[in-house]
């Protein structure tokens, strides 16, 4: 198969290689997926770059955990009728060496999720890490029907999906963006109230839409927003944080304690397997009824995977995808 891989960590152009590797074979309980589109996440580029001193977990790594494609072979114990089924894939390179930046990837059966016929491969390849993280942030502490959910970074990959999932789940969503110039990019049908963090007094602006406080916070930068979250959370609220800018974060401990606020930290590789499966079911169901859309940014052929990684590292709008040749 044609694939891209790295045998050591470093800058994308220095370590990513392309060529042919043996076709993988599915083992018991596994399926092989013929990949059409591979999704690139910040975690993929951080692993490749040795972020936070991480080392190579395997001698050779095919990067990327997310993808869409077609099941073309199954291992023992898997229903043979899965062959030919369109799927979206999550976790392909989570505690596994060979991910989705290749013509074929092998994953446990349940990590190849049936993709409804009317949904495109680009959407499917965009659901894995950001979608499952968003789902966990919104629903880990129970249903949100009738609740107020504050989503920081509502235009981001996780934030956008979190807002859409919360809306699908019956919540009223308040979103934040960094600058007032971004306000008109937010869909008011999903996020009826959006606050720009540069407005001067974002806490008062949020409180204007939630006088008794917000019940859930989906947090993209705990170190930057800890004081703001403290100012707007309701009694027994949950702050679910999947990111931060500073490794060490100061918290307004006593005010949060007196409000019985729960702080939940989210690392998607280690979510419970049952939670991932439920997230996959809900993401597919929401997407099937048109409740989820994804902003697609740049697309790169597999041969240009280093450019795709550099694009993710540089930041910018939209999901970065790699198309895999047939």
Predicted regions and their residues:
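Mid-domain Rossmann-like dinucleotide-binding core that forms the NAD(H)/NADP(H) cofactor-binding site
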Residues: 125-199
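NAD(P)H cofactor-binding loop motif with strongest signal on the N-terminal glycine-rich segment
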Residues: 153-154, 221, 244
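Short glycine/proline-centered loop/turn elements that form peptide/ligand docking sites
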Residues: 76-77, 175-185, 198, 221-226, ...
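Short amphipathic alpha-helix with an adjacent loop that forms part of the alpha/beta core around
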Residues: 201-212
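NAD(P)H dinucleotide-binding glycine-rich loop of Rossmann-like/cofactor-binding domains
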Residues: 80, 90-153
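Glycine-rich beta-strand-centered segment in the early N-terminal region that forms part
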Residues: 22-40, 51-93
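Glycine-rich phosphate-binding loop and adjacent beta-alpha segment
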Residues: 224-291, 324-326
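C-terminal capping/lid region of NAD(P)-dependent oxidoreductase domains
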Residues: 291-295, 306-326
